[in-house]
Amino acid sequence: MKRIVLLRLGHRPERDKRITTHVGLTARLLGAEGMLLASNDPGIIATLEDVVSRWGGNFYIKNNVNYKQEIKEWKAAGGKVCHLSMYGINLPDVTDELKSCDKLMIVVGAEKVPPEIYQLADWNVAVGSQPHSEVAAVAITLDRIADGEPLKREFQNAELTIVPAERGKQVIENLRD
């Protein structure tokens, strides 16, 4: 089973909470096992943990991590690092390599990322080579890597499950032990 984790850099609690939450929600939905937040924001952690509690799955969130240490440990354990931005190799040109990784850390920034990230990453990947949202970059990249498979999975231990319907909203409240 492929392991994917997202590392969020440069999160500014007062400015970026909504976007960082959406980055985490997107990563969870599209197959990442967890998110590492290289800032201190317990509110983000609480929000994402609440979603996991209600909607299921095993997504984890670590707060206030040392990004250099996390990257070092990930690579020492055989993982690869992909930094998403608007600079670098075009995503379509590197998708097959990313798909072949068993252990992939995806790095996205909020504010300007430290220049050393470009050196620490195995790939610096451009998603469109134009200004864009990090939420979009994560979504497009994870979808390309997984060929849409995460969109078909069921989240285990969910309190709530949406029933797909052409019209209307149907949510099932699941009984849990």
UniProtKB/Swiss-Prot annotation:
Subcellular location as annotated: Cytoplasm
Reactions catalysed according to its record: cytidine(56) in tRNA + S-adenosyl-L-methionine = 2'-O-methylcytidine(56) in tRNA + S-adenosyl-L-homocysteine + H(+)
Highest taxon of the lineage: Archaea
Enzyme class: transferase
Membrane found in the keyword field: no
Family annotation (InterPro entries): Alpha/beta_knot_MTases (IPR029028), tRNA_m1G_MTases_N (IPR029026), tRNA_mtfrase_aTrm56 (IPR002845)
Biological process (GO), any one: tRNA nucleoside ribose methylation
Keywords per UniProt: Cytoplasm, Methyltransferase, S-adenosyl-L-methionine, Transferase, tRNA processing
Residue positions binding S-adenosyl-L-methionine: L84, G109, A110, E111, K112, V113
Cellular compartments per GO CC: cytoplasm
EC number: 2.1.1.206
UniProt key word tRNA processing: yes
UniProt xrefs under Gene3D superfamilies: 3.40.1280.10
UniProt-recorded Gene Ontology molecular function terms: tRNA (cytidine(56)-2'-O)-methyltransferase activity
A Pfam family matched in the record: Trm56
Family under the similarity heading: Belongs to the aTrm56 family.
Quaternary structure (record): Homodimer.
Function: Specifically catalyzes the AdoMet-dependent 2'-O-ribose methylation of cytidine at position 56 in tRNAs.
Protein name, per record: tRNA (cytidine(56)-2'-O)-methyltransferase
Natural source organism: Methanosarcina barkeri (strain Fusaro / DSM 804)
